[in-house]
Amino acid sequence: MGNMMSKVNNLLYTKLRGLFSGQSERSITMIGLDGAGKTTLLLYLQTGEVHQTVPTLGFNCENVTLGSMKFQVWDIGGQNSFMRFWHQYINEGCGIIYMVDCADPQRFGKSGEELWRILNILNSPRPLLVLANKIDLIREHERSEVVKSIRNEFNLERYNGPSQVVPISVLQAGSMTSANDENGREIIDAFRWLNKELEKMPRAEAL
């Protein structure tokens, strides 16, 4: 089983590297533990609608356009069998999105450990956007404390690149064009921050 997984991963990685080269979109790697909502977010960004999804086995890749912002987003599976391969993908992207299930604080510790396992092997700092998903499941008066807890648990002050923690709710997001959709605006604003940080990077590093 281990050899089969290794062969499959090598094939996926080879394809990944080939698809990255020559792309005009800014390439973003999206990782996080299973169940955090990565694939749901990716489909929302692509279609503007919320879809129920199944766990990602391997990776998904979608080109996403948000106004004038263009991204190539790679959604890498968060199951244990795929987490050990994150390091092969992470240095190919110019930015990182790390998804966290903020309604599951018992996994904050493990989630933070896995994030730092990746950050410690980056070949250069890059923008890190931590999306605290499922904020709708947290009482409103507790939400700021949850975000603070994630930043502290992840020890983001140690990271020498730009970082931001943004609470979102993908399942509660409505149409991206709705002026009353606070959840949708939070998601778009998070990507605006990421895009702004990417624009500060030399173009060769941001592709």
From Swiss-Prot:
<dbReference type="GO" id="GO:0005794">
    <property type="term" value="C:Golgi apparatus"/>
</dbReference>
<keyword id="KW-0813">Transport</keyword>
<keyword id="KW-0342">GTP-binding</keyword>
<keyword id="KW-0333">Golgi apparatus</keyword>
<feature type="lipid moiety-binding region" description="N-myristoyl glycine">
    <location>
        <position position="2"/>
    </location>
</feature>
<feature type="binding site">
    <location>
        <begin position="32"/>
        <end position="39"/>
    </location>
    <ligand>
        <name>GTP</name>
    </ligand>
</feature>
<dbReference type="GO" id="GO:0015031">
    <property type="term" value="P:protein transport"/>
</dbReference>
<dbReference type="InterPro" id="IPR006689">
    <property type="entry name" value="Small_GTPase_ARF/SAR"/>
</dbReference>
<dbReference type="GO" id="GO:0003924">
    <property type="term" value="F:GTPase activity"/>
</dbReference>
<keyword id="KW-0449">Lipoprotein</keyword>
<protein>
    <recommendedName>
        <fullName>ADP-ribosylation factor</fullName>
    </recommendedName>
</protein>
<feature type="binding site">
    <location>
        <begin position="133"/>
        <end position="136"/>
    </location>
    <ligand>
        <name>GTP</name>
    </ligand>
</feature>
<comment type="similarity">
    <text>Belongs to the small GTPase superfamily. Arf family.</text>
</comment>
<keyword id="KW-0653">Protein transport</keyword>
<dbReference type="InterPro" id="IPR027417">
    <property type="entry name" value="P-loop_NTPase"/>
</dbReference>
<dbReference type="GO" id="GO:0016192">
    <property type="term" value="P:vesicle-mediated transport"/>
</dbReference>
<dbReference type="GO" id="GO:0005525">
    <property type="term" value="F:GTP binding"/>
</dbReference>
<feature type="binding site">
    <location>
        <begin position="75"/>
        <end position="79"/>
    </location>
    <ligand>
        <name>GTP</name>
    </ligand>
</feature>
<keyword id="KW-0519">Myristate</keyword>
<keyword id="KW-0547">Nucleotide-binding</keyword>
<comment type="function">
    <text>GTP-binding protein involved in protein trafficking; may modulate vesicle budding and uncoating within the Golgi apparatus.</text>
</comment>
<dbReference type="InterPro" id="IPR024156">
    <property type="entry name" value="Small_GTPase_ARF"/>
</dbReference>
<dbReference type="InterPro" id="IPR005225">
    <property type="entry name" value="Small_GTP-bd"/>
</dbReference>
<keyword id="KW-0931">ER-Golgi transport</keyword>
<dbReference type="Pfam" id="PF00025">
    <property type="entry name" value="Arf"/>
</dbReference>
